[in-house]
Regions:
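Long, low-complexity or tandemly repetitive, helically biased scaffold regions used
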Residues: 1-130
Length: 130
C-alpha cells in the first residue's frame, strides 16, 4: 500500500512537469522566427532543460523502478547530457538576431533534439498512462 501511494504521488508530481514540457514544446513548434521569437526560444529551452533536470534528480533514487519512471529518467538524462543550446542561442542573439532563417534553423534544431529518441512522443504516452 505504501509503495502504491508513493508511485501515485510521484506520478501526480511528474504529470505537472511533463505538461509544462509539452506546453513549451508546443510554443517552440508554433513560434514565429523573429527577434522576439529568439527570446522565447531562450526562455522555453531553459525551462525544458530545468524541468528535465528536476525529473532526472527526482528519479535518480533506486525506489522508482516502474517502467515509465525508468524511461523518463533515461530520457531526461540523455537529453541533459547530449543537448545544450545556450551558447548557440546567445550567439544568434548577439550576431544574427535579425536573421529569420538562422532563428528558424535554431528553432528546428531544438525541436528535432526534443524528438530525438521520440522523447516528446514518449512523454505524451506516459501522460496517457498515468
Amino acid at each position: 500500500m505504501k509503495i502504491t501511494n508513493l508511485l501515485m504521488d510521484i506520478d501526480e508530481y511528474l504529470k505537472g512537469i511533463l505538461w509544462q514540457i509539452l506546453d513549451s514544446y508546443k510554443i517552440l513548434a508554433e513560434l514565429d522566427d523573429t527577434t522576439n521569437g529568439l527570446d522565447i526560444i531562450k526562455k522555453q529551452t531553459s525551462k525544458i532543460n530545468g524541468l528535465l533536470q528536476v525529473i532526472n534528480n527526482k528519479l535518480n533514487e533506486k525506489r522508482y523502478q516502474s517502467d515509465h519512471l525508468v524511461t523518463l529518467r533515461k530520457l531526461s538524462k540523455y537529453y541533459i547530457t547530449t543537448y545544450d543550446y545556450s551558447r548557440e542561442i546567445e550567439y544568434v542573439l548577439e550576431i544574427y538576431s535579425d536573421d529569420p532563417n538562422r532563428i528558424k534553423n535554431l528553432r528546428i534544431l531544438i525541436i528535432n533534439s526534443l524528438n530525438d529518441r521520440r522523447m516528446i512522443e514518449k512523454i505524451q504516452n506516459i501522460l496517457d498512462e498515468i
